[in-house]
Amino acid sequence: SLFELGKMILQETGKNPAKSYGAYGCNCGVLGRGKPKDATDRCCYVHKCCYKKLTGCNPKKDRYSYSWKDKTIVCGENNPCLKELCECDKAVAICLRENLGTYNKLYRYHLKPFCKKADDC
């Protein structure tokens, strides 16, 4: 769910997920769509593609369990869809951390109508 995703992003990046990524670039946030503006935005694009591959669960609402061991996210679900959902969220959180160096505050509240059409996943 969005709750676990936000928690993972906070743990991995130390940033407030809603403030820092809720409307970042063309792909971060609920209304995200379009050609990525930078590496951080590309993380969100790949995350949306990961969600599109899921069947049998609702990425925004369904809760799953994970643990934070030695600064590492460990997904712990028996349900295959929820496990994949957790892995999608884990991947974007790690990607956002790995790209903190190129985070651009100018893209924090980027206007989505100015985004160019992106390739399909």
From Swiss-Prot:
Keywords: Disulfide bond, Myotoxin, Neurotoxin, Secreted, Toxin
Gene3D superfamilies xrefs: Phospholipase A2 domain
Chief location bin: secreted
SMART domains: PA2c (SM00085)
Any one GO cellular component localisation term in the record: extracellular region
Disulfide bonds: C26-C115, C28-C44, C43-C95, C49-C121, C50-C88, C57-C81, C75-C86
SUPFAM superfamilies, sorted: Phospholipase A2, PLA2
Site (Hydrophobic membrane-disruption site (MDiS)): L111, F114
Expression sites (tissue/organ): Expressed by the venom gland.
Gene Ontology annotations of biological process type: arachidonate secretion; lipid catabolic process; negative regulation of T cell proliferation; phospholipid metabolic process
Record Pfam families: Phospholip_A2_1
Regulation: Rosmarinic acid inhibits the myotoxic activity. Bromophenacyl bromide (BPB) inhibits the myotoxic activity through a covalent binding. Caffeic acid and aristolochic acid, two plant compounds used in folk medicine used to treat envenomation, inhibit the myotoxic activity.
Annotated positions for site Cationic membrane-docking site (MDoS): K112, K117
GO function terms (MF aspect): calcium ion binding; calcium-dependent phospholipase A2 activity; phospholipid binding; toxin activity
Cellular localization per UniProt: Secreted
Region of interest: Important for membrane-damaging activities in eukaryotes and bacteria: 105-117
Sequence similarity: Belongs to the phospholipase A2 family. Group II subfamily. K49 sub-subfamily.
Role description: Snake venom phospholipase A2 (PLA2) homolog that lacks enzymatic activity. Is myotoxic and displays edema-inducing activities. Induces neuromuscular blockage. A model of myotoxic mechanism has been proposed: an apo Lys49-PLA2 is activated by the entrance of a hydrophobic molecule (e.g. fatty acid) at the hydrophobic channel of the protein leading to a reorientation of a monomer.
Protein name: Basic phospholipase A2 homolog piratoxin-1
Species: Bothrops pirajai (Piraja's lancehead)
